[in-house]
Amino acid sequence: MLCGGSGTRLWPVSRKDFAKQHAPVLGGEAPFQDTLRRLAGPAFARPIVVAGAASRFMAADQAAEVGAAVDLVLEPEGRDTLAAVALAALVLAGRDPEAIGLVLPSDHMIPDAEAFAE
């Protein structure tokens, strides 16, 4: 799960050190938390969350709030999507060389979680 970004697209809700995926939407949970909930259950393995240093504590706290166990991997330096995906792929290959990965942004709104899981 890609959990980076600088938080500049949804200003003033998001800011440099508070990216939009961590901001509660419409009085509910943050999109990051919604994404973690969609990954709960037997169809998905423990998520690998790739985050920048600025959001590492927020990601860990919000994962704990929804009871999600994650492998939090910090980007040594923000290098956009491909580098984050490559980092997650290396971690996944170390976990299980035969695993199939699913790349997810942490800020998408998907109202039908059942359809997503299918």
Report the location of each language-model feature.
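Conserved N-terminal catalytic core of the sugar/cofactor nucleotidyltransferase
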Residues: M1, R9-K16, P24-A117
